[in-house]
Amino acid sequence: MQSPYVREAVREMDLPDEVIVYDTTLRDGEQTPGVSFTPEQKLEIAHLLDELGVQQIEAGFPVVSEGERDAVRRIAHEGLNADILCLARTLRGDVDAALDCDVDGVITFIATSELHLKHKLRMSREEVLERIADTVEYAKDHGLWVAFSAEDGTRTEFEFLERVYRTAEECGADRVHATDTVGVMIPAAMRLFVAKIREVVDLPIGVHCHDDFGMAVANSLAAVEAGAQAISTTVNGIGERAGNAALEEVIMALKELYGIDPGFNTEVLAELSRKVSEYSGIDVPPNKAVVGENAFRHESGIHVAAVLEEPRTYEPIDPKEVGMNRKIVLGKHTGRKAVVAKLEELGVEPEEEIVEEVLKRIKALGDRRVRVTDSKLEEIVRNVLESRGDRDDPGSR
């Protein structure tokens, strides 16, 4: 059930009919310190992204290594529905590496802020413009779809950024990216930024946001509110430093809050999240939105009673919609209805005396910070029944 205020706000927005998700788990996600996917793992993740319905998959950075090229090439040859892209610096050699992988397109980038020009590239603005023109034209001449990203664009003076984007457009780029490389934007600023870009180029705009201030998803959605038509994501929000905009959060927010749904098979999200967590070695926080272990778990007696009556009272998303399950957790906040529901699951008649005694023991364990698992509950119920002279095993009913 959507908030009436969200409905009212969205009605007043000039939203795009469709938003393209170009997922970079296999490239930017793999740049998470300590993460390295095998080619087989990359292929499996790519298949799950494709099953989800992601329109574009950024499969890697081919110039990095021969192993990376092999992995990108395998994904490109897999016959997926998604367009397969890869990253390329504004260098012909990087484009050649992409061509060698048979990808559909490239995301080519160069830094544009004075900070990067002075301390990293040691290049003039004119040299940057020349590199953009040469690389975009070269990639287009060789039949590639091309997106251009101005690295650290959100810290670049717009006077120069306008020239950057116009150069990319004039040389044939298919899309330009508003890139918040170090996550310094706020939603209001991102809306302003995208609006300014729309004034100077007649191309679709994508957005690539990092999460250094925890704003990647909010900034990505703000960009869509301002007319951006593509969002860069990673599964579980993994990526350099604090990570990127989380795929699962972006997709569900677009669908449930903005009414933008190109037909994603969202039931795949939980499996995809678990697989990326397993292969990356990065645990999903239990309170992670959409796919965290606690996202659909309830302990408070008041909440459990309401959820059992009408799930929407405390669940803005149906857990099955994202491949998750609702879980009633027992602890010191547990109420009678949760115990009744659990007893019924075990096939035990929820008589008043049994419910009260089980509830008392659960709360006592909760006060001692003992987690009441399903097996622990069965033990409690068994002891309560035995104390009443009933020897049946509740777990076998």
From Swiss-Prot:
GO molecular function: homocitrate synthase activity
Domain Pyruvate carboxyltransferase, residue spans: 19-270
UniProt xrefs under Pfam families: HCS_D2 (PF22617), HMGL-like (PF00682)
One GO-annotated biological process of the protein: carboxylic acid metabolic process
UniProt keyword terms in alphabetical order: Transferase
Pathway(s) it belongs to: Organic acid metabolism; 2-oxosuberate biosynthesis
EC number(s) on file: 2.3.3.14, 2.3.3.-
Keyword presence, Transferase: yes
Protein purpose: Catalyzes the condensation of alpha-ketoglutarate and acetyl-CoA to form (R)-homocitrate. Can also catalyze the condensation of alpha-ketoadipate with acetyl-CoA to form (R)-homo(2)citrate, and the condensation of alpha-ketopimelate with acetyl-CoA to form (R)-homo(3)citrate. These reactions are part of the biosynthesis pathway of coenzyme B and biotin.
UniProt xrefs under NCBIfam families: LEU1_arch (TIGR02090), PRK00915.1-2 (NF002085)
UniProt protein name: Homocitrate synthase AksA
